């Protein structure tokens, strides 16, 4: 019986996550926002969580499940790369340069944004020690 309750809770929470993503996609289409609908849904989801409209307890089991199974979502990307492996082997140096530059840009921009958000949070709390 416990297992059945867990599975039902998981399905309902995943459905809620998918619903918010779907709403984000529809908002993006309606307002012609130049972002992917899933990103709009992610921002909407973030706001719903921040303002406690959607409590964390409503999605914790579903979110944990998605985090634990995230690796499987990248398998199609790897399979797609295998389709163009011959092109990559011909230009492998350029391919790796692009990967290294892209990784560095993502790491640098993520770090910069995280620092700015932390500074803003500390300033708001009055604990700016920089």
From Swiss-Prot:
It comes from the Bacteria. GO terms for cellular component: plasma membrane. Keywords: Cell membrane, Cytolysis, Membrane, Transmembrane, Transmembrane helix. It is a multi-pass membrane protein. The keyword Transmembrane applies. It is found in: Cell membrane. The chain crosses the membrane at residues 6-26, 31-51, 65-85, 93-113. It holds the Pfam family LrgA. GO terms for biological process: cytolysis; killing of cells of another organism; programmed cell death. The keyword Metal-binding does not apply. Belongs to the CidA/LrgA family. CidA subfamily. PANTHER family: HOLIN-LIKE PROTEIN CIDA, HOLIN-LIKE PROTEIN CIDA-RELATED. Increases the activity of extracellular murein hydrolases possibly by mediating their export via hole formation. Inhibited by the antiholin-like proteins LrgAB. In an unstressed cell, the LrgAB products probably inhibit the function of the CidAB proteins. When a cell is stressed by the addition of antibiotics or by other factors in the environment, the CidAB proteins possibly oligomerize within the bacterial cell membrane, creating lesions that disrupt the proton motive force, which in turn results in loss of cell viability. This is Holin-like protein CidA. It comes from Staphylococcus epidermidis (strain ATCC 35984 / DSM 28319 / BCRC 17069 / CCUG 31568 / BM 3577 / RP62A). The lineage of its organism: Bacteria, Bacillati, Bacillota, Bacilli, Bacillales. The gene is cidA.
